[in-house]
Amino acid sequence: MANILTPVDVYKLVNDIQKQATGQVSIQAVDTSSFVAVGEAILRTGTENTLNAISTVLMRTIISRRPYDNKLGILEGSSERWGAVIRKLNFFDLEFEESTAYNATNATTGATQAPLTDGQSVDMYTIKKPKTLQINFTGTKVLQNHYTVFRDQLAQAFRSESEFASFIEGFLVNWSNMMEQKKENEDRLVLINAITGKYAMSNYCVDLVAEFNTKYSTTYTRAQLLTTYLTDFAKFVSARVKTDSKRLENRTISYHANLSSYPGILRHTPKRNQKMIMYSPLFIDIEANVYSTIFNPSYLGVGAFKEITYWQEPTHPTEVKGKPNILNVVNGESTTASEAVVFDYVLGILYDDEFMGTNYQFETSVTTPLNAAGLYYNVFTHVRKNYWTDYTENAIVYYLGAGGAPANSETPEVETTNSTKKSTAKVAASE
């Protein structure tokens, strides 16, 4: 197997490791002899310290063998914004009041307003408190894994550039890919929870097949629109998504949940704060059978766009099934939906960047002391993370119902609690 690193790459890595292990860079690896000298200096700091230094440097280094990229990295938020405890304050607009600076006639009632009257004063200290809603996102989930490194592996790694490159391959590449895919799977659960949660709350889920049939007074099925009438349907979908994207820029109480005991929350989502995740195979068909510019993400101008080839399972790529965590709009508490939701065909979701996401708050690798009997070390990786779904932020889910005659029109199936089917998605929205 070919090495994953060039000699220049190896020198840079080992110099970084030396700085991490010793705190100084008095010797720099520039060729084989200096590489060995630096390796000896590092090993003199102790094998446990050496492995810790290697772990620290490599966990922040991209190794370009065949790294696996998280297909849903679009969901990841920063620790600064989404740490372990987040208090999100929402401010409501205050109603305008009668002017006290002029005597005037009320335009609605016709009554005369005379605040400026001889012998009276205008109270400029009338209290009018701001109206706010506080939403708390708390909680931390933890994850741990470890692997074993034998002492001879470490000693051999510093004999030459090629040995070190082989060591790095065994040390990190597969491990890094495994961790990245773990993140993707958790991001996928957050996405499933958000999509099913919007439907469980009856909150802006658009059946594009039903909308098409309503607009054009037709009774086409989903299968017909995806084949015989694909051109017309593609144009309709493109126009609808672009229109919705523009509508999200308006400051309204639409496209998100509102608490029943509070005034409506006014939200707007500028283009730069919009994100979109779409099922790409359909648009590949559109590009191949219609024309490539009918739906181009760049035309939307959203902040971030991600195409995926399946939502939940590769064998059933368009399906989404889940019993979501939702927001109780009566008491403001996070709760689990009473019934699971099943979509046959989800097309995509357009959402505010604060609507959902994951946050990896802490990642570190720690090495154990040498096992004297077995001559090996264990390297543990610890991860602390959290997820969030804020249903009070804007989001629109697009799905394709079965279509056909109105009596046969399909909405996502809602499973009863006695159903034999199992939910495969259950993620806390705001624990």
Residue ranges of each PLM-predicted region?
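Long, contiguous amphipathic alpha-helices that act as assembly "spine/axial" helices in icosahedral shell
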Residues: 131-204, 375, 379-381
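Loop-centered beta-sheet repeat module
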Residues: 174, 185-237
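Short glycine-rich, low-complexity/disordered patches
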Residues: 30-32, 68-78, 184, 250-259
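Assembly/oligomerization interface modules of large self-assembling protein complexes
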Residues: 54-147
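Alpha-helix boundary/N-cap detector
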Residues: 5-8, 12, 38-49, 53, ...
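Extended oligomerization regions of viral-like shell subunits
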Residues: 224-357
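Extended, compositionally biased alpha-helical segments that mediate assembly or anchoring
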Residues: 1-65, 69, 294-431
